Curated annotation (Swiss-Prot):
Gene designation: ptsH
Function: General (non sugar-specific) component of the phosphoenolpyruvate-dependent sugar phosphotransferase system (sugar PTS). This major carbohydrate active-transport system catalyzes the phosphorylation of incoming sugar substrates concomitantly with their translocation across the cell membrane. The phosphoryl group from phosphoenolpyruvate (PEP) is transferred to the phosphoryl carrier protein HPr by enzyme I. Phospho-HPr then transfers it to the PTS EIIA domain.
Keyword Transcription regulation belongs to the record: yes
UniProt source species: Staphylococcus aureus
Keyword Transport: yes
Name of protein: Phosphocarrier protein HPr
Family: Belongs to the HPr family.
Documented activity regulation: Phosphorylation on Ser-46 inhibits the phosphoryl transfer from enzyme I to HPr.
PANTHER family, alphabetized: PHOSPHOCARRIER PROTEIN HPR (PTHR33705), PHOSPHOCARRIER PROTEIN NPR (PTHR33705:SF2)
GO biological process: phosphoenolpyruvate-dependent sugar phosphotransferase system
Subcellular location: Cytoplasm
């Protein structure tokens, strides 16, 4: 299992467009990928799960990946978070 933590810097947090990009990216991998915020974990392959967390600015999130392609999954998700302006 691999994990990485991030602080969200976008003024509106994880809103619909970047959430969609995260879900699409996570769905490309076989690994089980979870997003944790405020003690609650959701499947990062579920748009409803991601949006239900209401992740705002300055929130600390952790991404967990467990499976055969976990390293690639964490890297790809990190790239999306950065590209979408959610993290530095």
């Amino acid at each position: 299992m691999e994990q990485n933590s991030y602080v969200i810097i976008d003024e509106t947090g994880i809103h619909a467009r970047p959430a969609t990009m995260l879900v699409q990216t996570a769905s490309k991998f076989d690994s089980d990928i979870q997003l944790e915020y405020n003690g609650k974990k959701v499947n990062l392959k579920s748009i409803m799960g991601v949006m239900s967390l209401g992740v705002g600015k300055d929130a600390e999130i952790t991404i967990y990946a467990d499976g055969s392609d976990e390293s690639d999954a964490i890297q790809a998700i990190s790239d999306v978070l950065s590209k979408e302006g959610l993290t530095k």
